[in-house]
Amino acid sequence: MKAINNKHHFMVDLETLSSESNAHILETALVCFDPVSGEVSEHGTFHVRHGLDKQDGAIISVETLEWWYKTNRNYLAKLLNPKDEDKEILAFTLHRMQALFDDARGDGGLLVWNTGTFDVELLNNAFKRIINPNMTLINFWEVRDCRSLRTIGDMFPRLQQTVPEATHNAYEDCIRQIGYITDVTQYLAKQD
C-alpha cells in the first residue's frame, strides 16, 4: 500500500450538456484526497462553473438538456447562470489542472479517479481542443475507476451499504465517490 500512498490522488467529476466526448462542460470539480483516510486537501481542490461560455468544438445535446430539465431544472439554472465568484473560463481550469498534475507527477506520481472514463475522456478532449492538440492532460495509466472499488466492496458484506444517489453537483459527487474508495481501502488495510 506504501507505493500508492506516495502518489497524489485526485477525484474529478464534471457536469455537461452532452454525453459525447466533446460535450460542453458546465461544471468541474477536482478534489485532492487521501484514499485511506478520506481526508480532503484544500491544496489541489476546487469547484467551478463554466456556464455557457464559448468552448471551441464543444457540443450541446437536446436529449441531455431534456434530461437535466426533468432531473433537476433548478440546479441546471444555477449551472447555466453561475454567480461571478463561482465562474471560471474552462481554459483557465484546464491550465490549473495541468499545473497541479505536473507538480504531482514530479512529486511521487499522479492518480486521477472518476466514474468510468467519462470525465477523463471529456477533460482530455477539451484540453486537446482548447489548449494543445498534441498533449494529453491525463495519461491512461494515471486513471482509476471508482466502479472497480465499488464492485470489490459488493463482495464483502461488511462493506455493503446504501449507496447515496448522485446529486449531479460535481463537488458533492466527488466527495460521495471518495467515500467508496475510503471504505474499501480502510477495510483492506485492516486485513494486513
Language-model features: locations:
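Conserved non-catalytic scaffold segment of RNase H-like nuclease domains
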Residues: 2, 6-10, 15-113
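Acidic active-site catalytic centers that drive phospho-/nucleotidyl reactions
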Residues: 13-15, 119, 145, 173
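Feature marks short, surface-exposed loop/turn motifs that line or immediately flank catalytic pockets
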Residues: 18, 119, 150
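Residue-level signal for well-ordered alpha-helical scaffold segments within enzymatic catalytic domains
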Residues: 78, 96-99, 103, 121, ...
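Substrate-recognition/cap helix-loop segment adjacent to the acidic, metal-dependent catalytic center
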Residues: 101, 117-140
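Acidic, Mg2+-coordinating catalytic module of metal-dependent nucleases/exonucleases
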Residues: 110-117, 121-122, 157-192
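Short, flexible loop segments at boundaries between secondary-structure elements
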Residues: 137-157
